[in-house]
Amino acid sequence: MMAIRELKVCLLGDTGVGKSSIVCRFVQDHFDHNISPTIGASFMTKTVPCGNELHKFLIWDTAGQERFHSLAPMYYRGSAAAVIVYDITKQDSFYTLKKWVKELKEHGPENIVMAIAGNKCDLSDIREVPLKDAKEYAESIGAIVVETSAKNAINIEELFQGISRQIPPLDPHENGNNGTIKVEKPTMQASRRCC
């Protein structure tokens, strides 16, 4: 019997850093060069194995534009994890990332797993944010950090695997609704015939 855990994950960060592209690459293994900016938020799901569980990621991709910033708490409330994305070629996006982390720490779920994704690592020749800086910052806040490229499918799966590994295992003695669905193989039963 394999348990399916539903894990709400939100993506936060500046507009244009590649949040939607990361989600599309992870869920659909697709990259769109002409993707439109997200309005409000978009939603996708993907289920992946993790140990003896299945993690069903309920992924909320939030808009990065300032005018939608006030909607973000609606998406990170109740989240098991948050992926805060910055563009390695834009120092300003790394500064904004720190504001998102501060907001999550003040208003987000207490035990939220935080992952920092430095996207567009395929453009490392025009890098503005050293990986060393991202690693030091991630360590200081207890987050995982991964450099990704949605365009070239670099470390996208690893990002979500890292989140899965940080999610505490289910307590087998816990009662109640914890977002888990039991999946069992159907058993063959002898059929009864009437008449």
UniProtKB/Swiss-Prot annotation:
It holds the Pfam family Ras. One of its GO terms (molecular function) is GDP binding. A lipid is attached at C194, C195 (S-geranylgeranyl cysteine). It comes from Homo sapiens. Its cofactor is Mg(2+). Regulated by guanine nucleotide exchange factors (GEFs) including RIN3 and GAPVD1 which promote the exchange of bound GDP for free GTP. Regulated by GTPase activating proteins (GAPs) which increase the GTP hydrolysis activity. Inhibited by GDP dissociation inhibitors (GDIs) which prevent Rab-GDP dissociation. SUPFAM superfamilies: P-loop containing nucleoside triphosphate hydrolases. It catalyses: GTP + H2O = GDP + phosphate + H(+). CDD domains: Rab5_related. A motif (Switch 2) lies at residues 63-79. This is Ras-related protein Rab-31. Keywords: Cytoplasmic vesicle, Endosome, Golgi apparatus, GTP-binding, Hydrolase, Lipoprotein, Membrane, Nucleotide-binding, Phosphoprotein, Prenylation. Its EC number is 3.6.5.2. One of its GO terms (cellular component) is phagocytic cup. Switch 1, switch 2 and the interswitch regions are characteristic of Rab GTPases and mediate the interactions with Rab downstream effectors. The switch regions undergo conformational changes upon nucleotide binding which drive interaction with specific sets of effector proteins, with most effectors only binding to GTP-bound Rab. GTP binds at G16, G18, K19, S20, S21, D32, H33, T38, G64, N119, D122, A150, K151. Belongs to the small GTPase superfamily. Rab family. The small GTPases Rab are key regulators of intracellular membrane trafficking, from the formation of transport vesicles to their fusion with membranes. Rabs cycle between an inactive GDP-bound form and an active GTP-bound form that is able to recruit to membranes different set of downstream effectors directly responsible for vesicle formation, movement, tethering and fusion. Required for the integrity and for normal function of the Golgi apparatus and the trans-Golgi network. Plays a role in insulin-stimulated translocation of GLUT4 to the cell membrane. It comes from the Eukaryota. PANTHER family: PTHR47978. Its main location: Golgi. It is found in: Golgi apparatus, trans-Golgi network; Golgi apparatus, trans-Golgi network membrane; Early endosome; Cytoplasmic vesicle, Phagosome. The keyword Lyase does not apply. Interacts with OCRL. Interacts with NGFR. Interacts (in GDP-bound form) with RIN3 and GAPVD1, which function as guanine exchange factors (GEF). Interacts (in GTP-bound form) with EEA1. Interacts with EGFR. Interacts (in GTP-bound form) with APPL2; interaction contributes to or enhances recruitment of APPL2 to the phagosomes; interaction enhances Fc-gamma receptor-mediated phagocytosis through PI3K/Akt signaling in macrophages. The gene is RAB31. One of its GO terms (biological process) is receptor internalization. It is a lipid-anchor. Highest expression in placenta and brain with lower levels in heart and lung. Not detected in liver, skeletal muscle, kidney or pancreas.
